[in-house]
């Protein structure tokens, strides 16, 4: 698949989201619930957040994709994630994992490894420190922010992708997406994404929306990041600072067209790391 074909797949995925409005079930953190619900809605999908063990699996059975985000952990939420993830696996529903702060505490790291070991995860999206921690390549995370990444991000992502048969995404100045064989780099985005809380979690939400309609999860993840980054570029043109940028970002995601994605996505293929 060449770059032109990739851009067309990205655009077609956005069009299918708008046409079919897939339900995306989020078991996510308190900090970003409103933002991830809105970004899911604005891209054209339908968000739902059902965290209790009494209904997490049942709700997942209705969804087109499941997000597991460990930003505000508790034992009860981990149990709900496992129940929801098992139902998703049984039903062929893609699971997208956001390992927020993996490496910052033992509990976060152990929870991520437990989820990866017990579930089939379609996509894992994190920053360089989080993915470096989980792959064994190193990396330093303070709170939920990466303060020291890995020397070779594509290689670290590839190790994790091979180990768990998943698509691994490292978001940063350039986004790396790999299934352990194919490697894509997405170059859309804007530095102001680092000034708003939850920008990574919103990226994960969009990956899940794209995965609900695009069965090649490498293409789904790269397409979501290209669309998100393009919306950020457009939003930055009219924003005056972080607060107005956040509002403009949601507006631009809402108004983004498949044609804009086909024309504006900046993606390249790399050799296997």
Curated annotation (Swiss-Prot):
Cofactor: Mg(2+)
GO biological process entries: thiamine biosynthetic process; thiamine diphosphate biosynthetic process
Molecular-function annotations in GO: ATP binding; hydroxyethylthiazole kinase activity; magnesium ion binding
Matches recorded under Pfam families: HK
Record keyword Metal-binding present: yes
Name of encoding gene: thiM
Biological or metabolic pathway of the protein: Cofactor biosynthesis; thiamine diphosphate biosynthesis; 4-methyl-5-(2-phosphoethyl)-thiazole from 5-(2-hydroxyethyl)-4-methylthiazole: step 1/1
Protein name, per record: Hydroxyethylthiazole kinase
Residues where substrate binds: 49, 198
Binding-site positions, ATP: 125, 171
Domain of life according to the entry: Bacteria
Stretches of the chain forming a coiled coil according to its record: none
HAMAP family: Thz_kinase
Cysteine disulfide links: none
UniProt KW keywords: ATP-binding, Kinase, Magnesium, Metal-binding, Nucleotide-binding, Thiamine biosynthesis, Transferase
Assigned protein family: Belongs to the Thz kinase family.
